[in-house]
């Protein structure tokens, strides 16, 4: 499927906060690790620090858990 940096992708990992959301690939690691694609999203997740806005807006996924949007 050859996902590369800058591609817009849809997340297909059902347990992910960003399931079926579209994000932009920030980097792809070619060293052989399982979750080699770092994807950046516009919205943040629920993991913010208590009393502050925000949370994480990136996550690692395997190429098999992504499809080009």
UniProtKB/Swiss-Prot annotation:
It is a peripheral membrane protein. One of its GO terms (cellular component) is photosystem I reaction center. The keyword Membrane applies. It is found in: Cellular thylakoid membrane. Stabilizes the interaction between PsaC and the PSI core, assists the docking of the ferredoxin to PSI and interacts with ferredoxin-NADP oxidoreductase. Keywords: Membrane, Photosynthesis, Photosystem I, Thylakoid. This is Photosystem I reaction center subunit IV. Pfam families: PSI_PsaE. Belongs to the PsaE family. It comes from Prochlorococcus marinus (strain MIT 9312). PANTHER family: PHOTOSYSTEM I REACTION CENTER SUBUNIT IV A, CHLOROPLASTIC-RELATED (PTHR34549), PHOTOSYSTEM I SUBUNIT IV (PTHR34549:SF2). GO terms for biological process: photosynthesis. HAMAP family: PSI_PsaE. It comes from the Bacteria. InterPro entries: Elect_transpt_acc-like_dom_sf, PSI_PsaE.
């Amino acid at each position: 499927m050859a996902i590369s940096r800058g591609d817009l992708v849809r997340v297909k990992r059902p347990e992910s906060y960003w399931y079926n959301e579209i994000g932009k690939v920030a980097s792809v690691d070619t060293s052989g690790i399982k979750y080699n694609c770092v994807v950046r999203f516009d919205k943040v997740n629920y993991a913010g620090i208590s009393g502050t806005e925000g949370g994480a807006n990136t996550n690692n996924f395997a190429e098999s858990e992504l499809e080009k949007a």
